[in-house]
Amino acid sequence: MTDRLNIHRLTTETRNPQTASIHQADTMEILRIINQEDFKVAEAVQQVLPDIQIAVQFAHQSLRRNGRLIYAGAGTSGRLGVLDAVECPPTYSVSPDTVIGLMAGGADAFLQAAEGIEDSEETGALDLKTIGLTAEDTVIAIAASGRTPYAAGALKYAKTIGAKTVALTCNKHSLISTYADHSIEVVVGPEVITGSTRMKAATAHKMILNMISTAVMIKSGKVYENLMVDVHVSNEKLKERAIGIIQSITGVPYDKAKETLEAAGSHVKTAIVMLKTNSDETHAKALLKEAEGFIDKAIEQHVSKEKER
């Protein structure tokens, strides 16, 4: 058996001595055991914050160059990437191809497990070719084991193109880490149910992906204070949220916030700058464009220009 296939040496495949008798536990004890193990996940993530920071830097630079952040994974790992990617457009008003989640087997595999499809390195490379991977992109391959061929193939191909690459795994010295510019190896220990990496490993990866995409969007001016000022106003709930955001930042009454949001074409940042600078939509948009989308910079520029008059 090759070293690559000897999964029994992986931390994620070893037995957890704390859960060896879980089959004999009552319901509350089962839940307590799982909860106790889950506490270890956040601590493990804390240990790799410096590595996550580098991944954020890669992705942020890609977006500044009009590149993309691309997740690639199989099974649960692939689903996590898709989940993070699809939430970015409504939350931050980025286009659907700014953050992309690629999953072995495509959309069908998201709903129904297709375990065998992960064994093809060629498929990982092909999926990146299909979306036209460029050197401006950042690819984060996700695999709890650190040895999934689909993830390995994606990283190998991305390296040939010149894209920045990151391996996200739950095992030290993993195979896919050797194919990446940088790795995040978050060791959460053995699973509650041996080898069930949809549990602690997946939880850790979900936390890390949340951190990466959120930090990138903050650094891209999509957040002001702690508010999602680039929220895409696509339904009544989000419209009410947008009005609340405008009120919170500017202090205007509900009706004024609603009126300004409508005048700004439902663009929250424009409405905020309009109110903060007492300007119209055209001027507010020009200020935001000059400030690369950052509200505070747009307001500062306006104040500076007013002083020069």
Swiss-Prot record:
Domain annotation SIS: ranges: 59-222
EC numbers for this chain: 4.2.1.126
Family matches, as Gene3D superfamilies: 1.10.8.1080, Glucose-6-phosphate isomerase like protein, domain 1
A molecular function GO annotation: carbohydrate derivative binding
UniProt xrefs under InterPro entries: Etherase_MurQ, Glucokinase_regulatory_CS, MURQ/GCKR, SIS_dom, SIS_dom_sf
Keyword Metal-binding: no
Active site: 87 (proton donor), 118
Pathway in which the depicted protein is active: Amino-sugar metabolism; N-acetylmuramate degradation
TM region(s), chain numbering: none
Pfam families, per the entry: GKRP-like_C, GKRP_SIS_N
Plastid among keywords: no
Keywords, sorted A to Z: Carbohydrate metabolism, Lyase
Chemical reaction(s) catalysed: N-acetyl-D-muramate 6-phosphate + H2O = N-acetyl-D-glucosamine 6-phosphate + (R)-lactate
GO biological process per UniProt: amino sugar catabolic process; N-acetylmuramic acid catabolic process; peptidoglycan turnover
PANTHER family xrefs: GLUCOKINASE REGULATORY PROTEIN
Miscellaneous note of the record: A lyase-type mechanism (elimination/hydration) is suggested for the cleavage of the lactyl ether bond of MurNAc 6-phosphate, with the formation of an alpha,beta-unsaturated aldehyde intermediate with (E)-stereochemistry, followed by the syn addition of water to give product.
General function of this protein: Specifically catalyzes the cleavage of the D-lactyl ether substituent of MurNAc 6-phosphate, producing GlcNAc 6-phosphate and D-lactate.
Family per record: Belongs to the GCKR-like family. MurNAc-6-P etherase subfamily.
Subunit annotation: Homodimer.
Protein's name in the database: N-acetylmuramic acid 6-phosphate etherase
Taxonomic lineage of the native organism: Bacteria, Bacillati, Bacillota, Bacilli, Bacillales
Gene name of the encoded protein: murQ
